[in-house]
Amino acid sequence: ARWGFLSSQAKQPTIGKTIDESMDAIERENPSLRDVLPKVYARGTLEPTRLGSMIDLIGNIALGDAKARSADVLGHVFEYFLGEFALAEGKKGGQFYTPRSVVELLVEMLEPYKGRVFDPCCGSGGMFVQSEKFVADHQGRVNDISIYGQESNQTTWRLAKMNLAIRGIDSSQVKWNNEGSFL
C-alpha cells in the first residue's frame, strides 16, 4: 500500500485491482478504518487510464521534500476536494461540509484547550481537525482533548474517518449512528 508502488502501477490495466488491494492493506494496518475505505476500483466502472491519471495528479501535488508530503498537505488536498464536491452538490453538499471559515470561528469561540470535543453531526470531521489545530497553535497539548462525534449518513461518516486518519487524529470515538439519537 505504498504510494511509490501505486505510482509505478498507474499505467497498468490492473490499476483498479491494485488500488483495492491497497485499500485492504491500509485497513489491516489501521483498524479504525475497517470497512471505511472504498474498494470499488476493480469493478471496471472507472476507466483504468482515468484512475492512473488521478494517481499521477495526486503524486504531482505531493512532490517535493518530506515536509511537502506531510499529513497537513494531504489534509488540505482532501479538504479542497470536499469543498469542490460540496459546491457541485449545492445544498445537498452542506450535509457533510461546513466551510472552513465557519468551523474556525466556532472553534475560536469554544477555545478547546482541554477536555472533550463533541460534534453530534460531525460531517467530514472539520470541527475535530480545527480543534486539534487550535490546541497546537496555542502551544497546548493535543493529547489534552478527546474527540467524540456521530454522523447519521454512512458515506459522510466514512469521509470523516478518512479525513481524521489522513491527519493522524484518533477517530475511534467517531461513530456512525443512523438512529437519530445521541450516542
Describe the predicted segments one by one.
Residues 92-183:
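Conserved S-adenosyl-L-methionine
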Residues 1-113, 174-182:
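Non-catalytic, mostly N-terminal accessory regions of nucleic-acid modification and defense proteins
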